[in-house]
UniProtKB/Swiss-Prot annotation:
Family the UniProt entry places it in: Belongs to the tetrahydrofolate dehydrogenase/cyclohydrolase family.
HAMAP family associated with the record: THF_DHG_CYH (MF_01576)
Enzymatic reactions: (6R)-5,10-methylene-5,6,7,8-tetrahydrofolate + NADP(+) = (6R)-5,10-methenyltetrahydrofolate + NADPH; (6R)-5,10-methenyltetrahydrofolate + H2O = (6R)-10-formyltetrahydrofolate + H(+)
EC number: 1.5.1.5, 3.5.4.9
Entry function: Catalyzes the oxidation of 5,10-methylenetetrahydrofolate to 5,10-methenyltetrahydrofolate and then the hydrolysis of 5,10-methenyltetrahydrofolate to 10-formyltetrahydrofolate.
Protein name per its UniProtKB record: Bifunctional protein FolD
Xref: InterPro entries: Aminoacid_DH-like_N_sf, NAD(P)-bd_dom_sf, THF_DH/CycHdrlase, THF_DH/CycHdrlase_cat_dom, THF_DH/CycHdrlase_CS, THF_DH/CycHdrlase_NAD-bd_dom
Pathway recorded for this protein: One-carbon metabolism; tetrahydrofolate interconversion
Leader sequence residues: none
Keyword annotations of the record: Amino-acid biosynthesis, Histidine biosynthesis, Hydrolase, Methionine biosynthesis, Multifunctional enzyme, NADP, One-carbon metabolism, Oxidoreductase, Purine biosynthesis
UniProt-listed GO biological process terms: L-histidine biosynthetic process; methionine biosynthetic process; purine nucleotide biosynthetic process; tetrahydrofolate interconversion
Length: 299
């Protein structure tokens, strides 16, 4: 039976470090990490995500502000707000909650955020830094950053000699995951929906990362015995056994089968998910440390 990688516990550890290092930063420099969260419209899921991020920021001792714009807000209004936040010295991290209404160009909005305050890690400059191995000076997207901490807890920071397979090529998870694994000296293969003989490729992995958004796509016989399996997927599927109309969350991996084969595995829920918000807090603290000219903490 595989070792369970407890994302909730790891996330608590990261947040605990953020709290401690924030107190040290404030005591030494007087700088309080500041994060601004911007939401456009009233999408219920987005409201829940934003509330949890704001709550966690306050728990960490951050200066946290939330800007709520109506669904009808123009793109220019949003861009003007971002520019004002770019110029606000009390704000070190800016997060625009996605998705945005259809009349707003998300790409343009993201590229308007100052790269130094882009704690989501989506600006072209941060993407480029990560792609050229400048991991220390980049902001890394929060989900793959959290997944890497999970991998490091099992294998250490140097992945030399290990084969990693990332299933999924999204800009948010798949591509940055590839770059992080490569920077840690793993031999990395990126696979996707058009990859030939995907199960055979997955079976070569000492570290298998699933990030495709397909419920339970990765079967137990895709997993190399003893491999570390990181399941990034969060999918809601019908659960008639719980009653009519009920649902449950599953990952991209068939957990029940994969757990029998893997050496270590993340559950869904309670795996990578909690790490995402924790790493957002870590990135915000890092931004404040860079502003203060002090060394950023290691997570």
């Amino acid at each position: 039976m595989a070792q369970l990688i407890d994302g909730k516990k790891l996330a608590e550890d990261v947040v605990s470090t953020v709290k401690t290092e924030t107190e040290k930063l404030v005591a030494a420099t007087g700088i309080v990490p500041g994060i601004a969260v911007v939401i456009v419209g009233e999408d219920p899921a987005s409201q829940v995500y934003v509330a949890s991020k704001s709550k966690k920021a306050k728990e960490c001792g951050f200066h946290s502000v939330q800007h709520d714009l109506p669904e009808t807000a123009s793109e220019q209004e949003l861009l003007d707000l971002i520019e004002s936040l770019n110029n606000d010295p009390a704000i070190h991290g800016i997060l625009v909650q996605l998705p945005l209404p259809k009349h707003i160009d998300s790409g343009r909005v993201i590229q308007t955020i100052s790269p130094d305050k882009d704690v989501d890690g989506f600006h072209f400059i941060n993407v480029g830094k990560l792609g050229t191995g400048e991991v220390e000076t980049a902001f890394v997207p929060c989900t793959p950053a959290g997944a890497m901490i999970m991998i490091e807890r099992i294998h250490g920071r140097d992945l030399s000699g290990l084969n990693a397979v990332v299933i999924g090529r999204s800009n948010i998870v798949g591509k940055p995951m590839f770059n992080l694994l490569l920077a840690a000296n793993a031999t990395v293969t990126v696979a996707h929906s058009r990859t030939k003989d995907l199960p055979a490729i997955a079976r070569t992995a000492d570290i298998l990362v699933a990030a495709v958004g397909r419920p339970q796509m990765v079967k137990g016989d895709w997993v190399k015995p003893g491999a570390t399996v990181i399941d990034v997927g969060i999918n809601r599927i019908p659960a008639p056994e719980r009653g009519e109309g009920r649902t449950r969350l599953v990952g991209d991996v068939d957990f029940v089968e994969a757990e029998k084969v893997a050496g270590a595995i993340t559950p869904v829920p309670g795996g990578v998910g909690p790490m995402t918000i924790a790493m957002l807090m870590a990135n915000t603290l890092t931004a404040a440390c860079r502003t203060a000219g002090v060394k950023k903490p290691v997570f």
